Regions:
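Glycine- and aromatic-enriched membrane alpha-helices
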Residues: 1-422
Length: 422
């Protein structure tokens, strides 16, 4: 067992877990002051619920081993409650539980991302029901499609879901998704779009009506997300080696370029570059580089960042043109950014991209993976959300939304600056 790599993976897991509190600040600053508690609680609720489900059965579904190389849904019953993962096989590079912890943080942040689409108007209890069901029937299986890493009987490292191993058998190459452009960002973005349609628009929804109540929170959240993203991307190599270093550098270069690209578009479009734009641009670049961070030259990572920042800055206005209320631009940043990064690899992935190999295979595989995850997640998220809305109710009453969801749902206010009563 390599103690250095084990420490690297555990540190990466801690960094990725920090991303969810970072997301809470990012989302919390973007909403109205009377919704900040509700918004942040949806992220922290995801930590609690998904952390438990992952240990009980989530890992067993997401990483079913050899049986999951082709099947779209399978389960390793021996991994339920992590029962067969407590011992480290001879020759293994690191303890299985280190990998379990690392991937748990991916499941948590993916679910939390979806919540941004339903800000200001969702019941906390209904959100928790959705989070648990969606994670079970969507995230856990989709993670197996893309990742399904595992330790073989001889302790060697093997992987392959149907989007990797299965498509490779057909096209000669599997999907390249280094850290989750499909399984995390396209997946969450598609679910966010579905929930935005199910819950409908906020009261008074219109461009310019709802402005972020706390831009410093947004910047703080973006900074924590960026910091944690080094664990997300570099940690996905599962070894402290040259590929991890490449992923680390690209996690600096792409979001930095995206930040600039977003600000340029914002200046041209709206007349002023904003702090929220800078934060959103950085996140858009982080999303786009996620699938590509280990497979791109840094120069092409910068180009990807510029494209993602500029396109996502334009994409966030689609909700006003198309009439859906994606409150915090999960669709415009995560779905669009994830699609850009995933498809970009079809052209410029080292060795297999169209511009390097002359073959369309990688681009075709990337498109199949992106579309498959998008459709699967959207359809099931819509069905789950619709059933919740028609049974226990997903959306608060309009008068409660106007009064302030924090008080109605949680009995708290985000900014009570007064001495506590004795």
């Amino acid at each position: 067992m390599d103690q250095g790599n084990t420490a690297f993976i555990l540190l990466a897991a801690a960094l990725v877990l920090l991303m969810t509190p970072g997301l809470a600040f990012f989302y919390g600053g973007l909403v109205k002051a009377k919704s900040v508690i509700s918004m942040m609680m949806m992220s922290f609720g995801a930590i609690g619920l998904i952390g438990v489900l992952w240990a009980i059965y989530g890992y067993a579904i997401a990483f079913p081993g050899a049986e999951g190389t082709i099947a779209p849904w399978s389960i390793d019953t021996g991994a339920l409650f992590l029962n067969n993962l407590l011992e480290t096989p001879d020759g293994a590079a690191f303890p299985p539980l280190a990998f379990v912890a690392f991937q748990a943080t991916f499941a948590i942040i993916t679910v939390a991302l979806v919540s941004g689409a339903i800000a200001d108007r969702a019941k906390f209890g209904a959100w928790m029901v959705f989070a648990g069901v969606w994670a079970t029937v969507v995230y856990f299986p989709v993670a197996s499609w893309v990742f399904n890493f595992g330790l073989a009987d001889d302790g060697s490292f093997a992987y392959g879901g149907w989007l990797t191993h299965g498509l490779q058998d057909v096209f000669g190459t599997g999907v390249i998704d280094f850290a989750g452009g499909t399984a995390v960002h396209i997946n969450a973005g598609a679910a966010a779009l579905a929930l935005a349609l199910v819950l409908g628009k906020r009261v008074g929804f219109a461009k310019g009506i709802s402005v972020p109540h706390n831009p410093p929170f947004v910047l703080l959240g973006a900074g924590l997300l960026w910091f944690g993203w080094f664990g997300f991307n570099a940690g996905s190599e599962l070894a402290a080696d040259g590929t991890a270093a490449l992923a680390f550098v690209n996690t600096i270069a792409a979001p930095a370029a995206a930040l600039l690209g977003w600000l340029v578009v914002e200046k041209i479009k709206d007349g002023k570059p904003t702090s929220v734009g800078a934060a959103s641009g950085a996140v858009a670049g982080l999303v786009a580089i996620t699938p590509a961070c280990g497979s791109l030259h840094p120069l092409w990572a910068i180009v990807l960042g510029l494209i993602a920042g500029a396109v996502c800055a334009l994409a966030i206005d689609l909700k006003f043109k198309l009439g859906f209320d994606d409150s915090l631009d999960v669709v415009g940043i995560h779905l669009v950014g994830g699609l850009i990064g995933t498809l970009y690899l079809g052209f410029l992935a080292n060795g297999t991209g169209l511009f390097f190999s002359g073959s369309w295979s990688q681009l075709l595989v990337q498109a199949i993976a992106a579309i498959s995850v998008l459709i699967y997640s959207f359809v099931l998220a819509f069905v789950i959300g619709f059933v919740i809305e028609k049974t226990i109710g997903f959306r608060v009453k309009n008068e409660d939304e106007i009064a302030g969801i924090d008080q109605v749902v949680h009995g708290e206010e985000g900014y009570v600056l007064a001495d506590a009563k004795a």
